[in-house]
Amino acid sequence: NSLIALVVFGRATGHRLKEIVKPNTAHDELPRDGAELALTRLDHFRHAKGGSPTAAVRAEMQKTMTRHAAVFRDSALLAEGVSKLAEVNRRMQDISVADRSLIWNTDLIETLELDNMMAQSVVTMASAENRKESRGAHAHEDFPERDDANWMKHTAAWFEGWGGN
């Protein structure tokens, strides 16, 4: 279901963008400090000398998400998942990147990917715990019915990662 939805809505988005984005039209200016933030993040992880290897933290994150955020879940499991994932996320402060080079550095790339996935995982787990209904791929066993009166809405979430951004 999710894959076909991505294909359908991706296609629709592409068609709509073709209508509203005109060739050679200027875009909004990027934030002046955007490059600085990206380079600071890159250097932060490139020079990380903690005791937690990226692969170990990633495996723990995946295990936690698989166990606590699968399609069928209940309130207790989700609450436990939020707590466990917070512990795993704290390990990002102790991450270890052995390769310091800037050329073909798969260790650094995997760490940056983990940082992105960790942010998404934390938000996904917290959002699932917060939603008190079942809808789509979210089957909450304590709330088996869809609740349009309270949950027919979008949820916005912010995540403060390593740099608070």
Residue map of PLM features:
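Glycine- and aromatic-enriched mobile tails/lids
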Residues: N1-N165
